[in-house]
């Protein structure tokens, strides 16, 4: 299974909220996922990014690839 770490969209119309998840690369954006490791709220006064750094490091060590957006969001932490 080729795993990737990416964002799935939650929230309602025009009010996005994203969950950072580990999933199979062949699944749809909002399809099933293996593990949720954090979230991203771009609409807060200061955008909020929270994630479990240990789990992120674990998944990258076993071969999961990060999407461009996840790599950008996690690089600042």
Swiss-Prot record:
Offer a single GO CC term for the protein.
Answer: cytoplasm
* Pfam families referenced in this protein's UniProt entry, alphabetically: Ribosomal_S16
Presence of keyword Lyase: no
Q: Which GO terms describe its biological process?
A: translation
GO molecular function terms noted in the UniProt entry: structural constituent of ribosome
- Alphabetical UniProt keywords: Ribonucleoprotein, Ribosomal protein
- Does the record bear Ribonucleoprotein in its keywords? yes
Into which family does the record put it?
Belongs to the bacterial ribosomal protein bS16 family.
- The protein depicted here goes by the name Small ribosomal subunit protein bS16
């Amino acid at each position: 299974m080729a795993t990737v770490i990416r964002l799935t969209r939650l929230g309602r119309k025009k009010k996005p909220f994203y969950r950072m998840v580990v999933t199979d690369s062949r699944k749809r954006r909002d399809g099933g996922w293996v593990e949720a490791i954090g979230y991203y709220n771009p609409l807060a006064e200061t955008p909020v990014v929270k994630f479990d750094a240990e789990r992120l490091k674990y998944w990258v060590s076993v071969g999961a690839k990060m999407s461009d957006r996840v790599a950008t969001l996690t690089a600042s932490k």
